[in-house]
From Swiss-Prot:
Coiled coil: 649-729
Name by which UniProt lists this protein: Rho GTPase-activating protein 24
Residue ranges, compositional bias (Low complexity): 617-641
Protein keywords: Angiogenesis, Cell junction, Cell projection, Coiled coil, Cytoplasm, Cytoskeleton, Developmental protein, Differentiation, GTPase activation, Phosphoprotein
Keyword Cytoplasm assigned: yes
Source species, domain of life: Eukaryota
A GO MF term: GTPase activator activity
A biological-process GO annotation: wound healing, spreading of epidermal cells
GO cellular component terms attached to this protein's record: adherens junction; cell projection; cytoplasm; cytoskeleton; focal adhesion
Principal localisation: cytoplasm
Gene name as annotated: ARHGAP24
InterPro entries attached to this UniProt entry: PH-like_dom_sf, PH_domain, Rho_GTPase_activation_prot, RhoGAP, RhoGAP_dom
Length: 748
């Protein structure tokens, strides 16, 4: 706060006086004698200028407002005509001025003083979010945008939320007044940039009065002055023809500025919620319209005649806006179509898996389903070199002759992904399909091809293909690729219909065209799959007994066999046979370890005969018991089981480590939470103690002031008594002297 008596600037020249926030006559106390001087004050920008006269151009001084505060002085009974307020340095900030001087000002009326105090506070606290009472709605919304987009100012939302929680059933809501002193304190707190909170002890009527006060203090009401006559005409039209009046009213509402429109919509919807409890709170639509109508819609010149003429019309108009707010303020289509955020990845996986199962059921129930073809053939060498690096790359697809029009979308993201693991501990190309099923929908005349590096196998099947895996983690494919394509039953070898399957970072499988194979191969090297990327949520909840069942010799509870019955309508997984029967049976050989495959697609007849032979073999193997199957593959069981046992042990160890790590994190977070709660409780206790100390100090200050006043009164009484005593004593001493002089005895 600075006073510049030697200012050479001329703030009132040109348009300076037009840009003034407020101007008027005030009396300022100044000088060594502290006498009152009448000055012309002009509030402009962040400074308060004062002049000797209204026509003067050179200010006598300036008061720099930022960093200071303004406070009102209570009315003194001895001087009832003085309305004092003071601009003092410091405020609630750490800023202090150079001269540490305060200014005591006096207004002519109480209203004039309150207007000056509000204007000065708005200048001081405006940059800090304060001074919102009497501030333009646009300025308030513009400042609060830093906290996010809102329909209404934060003060309005805070009051509305509190009333929603505690006041909807309060009788006489918005009709009964709140505590005037508490409303004043809350207003001053908000004007000073504070954010006071309402607790359970706060009076609901006080908060309601604060909300009404904010709307009443707006420089321009929610419905601007320029729209006053237009809205009155809508009200008159409503009385004649309601439908046309509502349409015209909706048109006028849409023409409002955005901030006014949002605030009006927010208030009308809230008031409609309040009137829904009218049976308890006794506040019907008409009562609410009577209370809020003058605060929402009022004329610029509030003379008694205009107010009396427009009261009934404004009440009717406000009633319509509350009761028909759905028509006047339609919900935005964007908000309705916007997807909900915060959905977890596991829930999405479960939902997609469920959709995939429903789709499979629909495909299985189809009577006239097209034929499908499952084939196992040799993978391409470029893909083999890329897979040996340990990174999941784009998977190659077989070439088909099917036309482009016959290709339909293959949805593989609805189910948990399919992956083949190659373990060096296995004797030959031991592939393990882990974690999840692979389902797809088909159209008439389409067939499906699946390729792995372990030889060739082809069989014609119909409907959907589904492969269910184990509960183990997944690894990248080595020395081979997995692909899935759609081909026509008539032709093979057309490259126009090739689809590639690749792994994404979240564990899903995508199908891509063959022309994107190189790009997918480069991207796949950066997307290495974790051990638990493809573990389904429902598998993570299994108990220890279910996990130990993987170590069993027959592997009866977790299988990834692809069943190929010749007369079945679907090609789906079996859960009762050993996985080696399909992956290691039928003379499968690894093209890398054992040389080239024995099956070749160049001989269609041999291909069909081998396919039929393997189909019969698969059907006969499923007809036998699990003991027969174990005897058939007794040669490979020992090494495979040892490898599986080591894999399961490593996975269990990793899960145990993760469990210990997560438990330690949880314990540390809980400990931190307890520490913070203890600190918060101590801070609350300290705050309560400080509040009690402050209250005690206030009481002591008041007692001291009263004692001071009593002492002054006693001093005055003593002074009067002493004066009276001295005057009386003086008269008594003077009269005897005069008597002695009059009775003088002369001695001769």
């Amino acid at each position: 706060m600075e006073e510049n008596n030697d200012s050479t600037e001329n703030p009132q020249q040109g348009q300076g006086r037009q840009n003034a926030i407020k101007c008027g006559w005030l009396r300022k106390q100044g000088g060594f004698v502290k006498t009152w001087h009448t000055r012309w004050f002009v509030l402009k920008g962040d400074q308060l200028y004062y002049f000797k006269d209204e026509d003067e151009t050179k200010p006598l001084g300036t008061i720099f407002l930022p960093g200071n505060k303004v406070s009102e002085h209570p009315c003194n009974e001895e001087n009832p005509g003085k309305f004092l307020f003071e601009v003092v340095p410091g405020g609630d900030r750490d800023r202090m001025t150079a001269n540490h001087e305060s200014y005591l000002l006096m207004a002519s009326t109480q209203n004039d003083m309150e207007d000056w105090v509000k204007s000065i506070r708005r200048v001081i606290w405006g940059p800090f979010g304060g001074g919102i009472f009497g501030q333009k709605l646009e300025d308030t919304v513009r400042y609060e945008k830093r906290y996010g987009n809102r329909l209404a100012p934060m003060l309005v939302e805070q009051c509305v939320d509190f009333i929603r929680q505690r006041g909807l059933k309060e009788e006489g809501l918005f009709r009964l007044p709140g505590q005037a002193n508490l409303v004043k304190e809350l207003q001053d707190a908000f004007d000073c940039g504070e954010k006071p909170s309402f607790d359970s002890n706060t009076d609901v009527h006080t908060v309601a009065s604060l909300l009404k006060l904010y709307l009443r203090e707006l420089p321009e009401p929610v419905i601007p002055y320029a729209k006053y006559e237009d809205f009155l005409s809508c009200a008159k039209l409503l009385s004649k023809e309601e439908e046309a009046g509502v349409k015209e009213l909706a048109k006028q509402v849409k023409s409002l500025p955005v901030v006014n429109y949002n605030l009006l919509k927010y208030i009308c919807r809230f008031l409609d919620e309040v009137q829904s409890y009218s049976g308890v709170n006794k506040m019907s639509v008409q009562n609410l319209a009577t209370v809020f109508g003058p605060n929402i819609l009022r004329p610029k010149v509030e003379d008694p005649l205009t107010i009396m003429e427009g009261t009934v019309v404004v009440q009717q108009l406000m009633s319509v806006m509350i009761s028909k707010h759905d028509c006047l303020f339609p919900k935005d289509a964007e908000l309705q179509s916007k997807p909900q955020d915060g959905v977890s990845n596991n829930n999405e996986i479960q939902k997609k898996a469920t959709m995939g199962q429903l789709q499979n059921k629909e495909n299985n129930n189809t009577k006239d389903s097209p034929s499908r073809q499952c084939s196992w053939d040799k993978s391409e060498s470029p893909q083999r070199s890329s897979m040996n690096n340990g990174s999941p790359t784009a998977l190659s697809g077989s070439k088909t002759n099917s036309p482009k029009n016959s290709v339909h979308k293959l949805d593989v993201s609805r189910s948990p992904p399919l992956m083949v693991k190659k373990n060096p501990a296995f004797n030959k190309g031991s592939g393990i399909v882990t974690n999840g099923s692979f389902s797809s929908s088909n159209a008439e005349g389409l067939e499906k091809t699946q390729t792995t590096p372990n030889g060739s196998l082809q069989a014609r099947r119909s409907s959907s293909l589904k492969v269910s895996g184990t509960k183990m983690g997944t690894h990248s494919v080595q020395n081979g690729t997995v692909r899935m394509g759609i081909l026509n039953s008539d032709t093979l070898g057309n490259p126009t219909n090739v689809r590639n399957m690749s792994w994404l970072p979240n564990g899903y499988v995508t199908l891509r065209d063959n022309k994107q194979k190189e790009q997918a191969g480069e991207l796949g090297q950066h997307n290495r799959l974790s051990t638990y990327d493809n573990v389904h949520q429902q598998f993570s909840m299994m108990n220890l007994d279910d996990k130990q069942s993987i170590d069993s010799a027959t592997w009866s509870t977790s299988s990834c066999e692809i069943s190929l019955p010749e007369n079945s309508n679907s090609c789906r997984s079996s859960t009762t046979t050993c996985p080696e029967q399909d992956f290691f049976g039928g003379n499968f050989e690894d093209p890398v370890l054992d040389g080239p495959p024995q099956d070749d697609l160049s001989h269609p007849r041999d291909y069909e005969s081998k396919s039929d032979h393997r189909s019969v073999g698969g059907r006969s193997s499923r007809a036998t018991s699990s003991s027969d199957n174990s005897e058939t593959f007794v040669g490979n069981s020992s090494s495979n089981h040892s490898a599986l046992h080591s894999l399961v042990s490593s996975l269990k160890q990793e899960m145990t480590k993760q469990k210990i790590e997560y438990e330690s994190r949880i314990k540390s977070l809980e400990q931190r939470n307890l520490t913070l709660e203890t600190e918060m409780m101590s801070l609350h206790d300290e705050l309560d103690q400080e509040r009690k100390k402050f209250t005690m100090i206030e009481i002591k200050m008041r007692n001291a002031e009263r004692a001071k006043e009593d002492a002054e009164k006693r001093n005055d009484m003593l002074q009067k008594e002493m004066e009276q005593f001295f005057s009386t004593f003086g008269e008594l001493t003077v009269e005897p002297r005069r008597t002695e002089r009059g009775n003088t005895i002369w001695i001769q």
